[in-house]
């Protein structure tokens, strides 16, 4: 199974996010300068909420012109199932995701039964951090808008995603950031926040 181990921290203030990304605590761990990636995401589900009932997420995201279809499923703690394929179209991506190990029910869905339900448009400020000799993570500051039901809300959050090594080192770094900047974990995904706008 594809896996993602991630901390998502609510920031809510653009100046605070900039302060965190430029802090010594972060910059002394940078492996390379920050990249700025423009992202546009559309989330899909069936009319009867087939994916929502299972707490699955299916999205089509363009990342600086590159299109990726991603499937995520619940996991334990900060780890989730995640599979992705480079594709501009859901119909060709569903069977490929299932072949990679995503739930097989995905392949049986009719693409025309899936409809956009909400979305997000944001800039991702991202770089790899070296936390310890054997542990690295991606730090991502996401700034933009969530959209759903004709409504829009500000998106401003920080993500830490384990790339290799020890989850305990990632947890310790996330806790250090939370303690230093009075942050809390964001319990809701971008999908959940955007979907709430449409309700």
Where in the sequence are the language-model features?
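Phosphate-end processing signature that detects enzymes handling 5′-triphosphorylated RNA
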Residues: 1-199
């Amino acid at each position: 199974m594809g896996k993602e181990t991630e901390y998502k921290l609510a920031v809510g203030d653009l100046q605070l996010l900039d302060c965190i990304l430029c802090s010594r605590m972060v910059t002394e761990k940078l492996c390379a300068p920050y990249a700025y990636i423009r992202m546009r995401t559309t989330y899909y589900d069936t009319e009867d909420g087939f994916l929502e009932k299972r707490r699955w997420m299916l999205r089509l995201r363009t990342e600086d012109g590159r299109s990726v279809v991603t499937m995520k499923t619940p996991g334990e703690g900060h780890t989730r199932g995640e599979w992705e394929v480079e594709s501009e179209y859901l119909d060709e991506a569903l069977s490929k995701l299932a072949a990679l190990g995503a739930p097989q029910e995905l392949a049986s869905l009719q693409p025309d039964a899936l409809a956009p339900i909400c979305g997000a448009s944001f800039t991702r400020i991202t770089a790899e951090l070296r936390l310890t000799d054997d542990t690295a993570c991606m730090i991502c500051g996401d700034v933009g808008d969530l959209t759903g039901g004709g409504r829009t809300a500000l998106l401003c959050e920080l993500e830490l995603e384990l790339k290799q090594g020890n989850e305990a080192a990632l947890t310790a770094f996330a806790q250090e950031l939370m303690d230093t900047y009075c942050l809390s974990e964001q319990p809701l995904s971008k999908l959940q926040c955007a979907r709430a706008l449409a309700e």
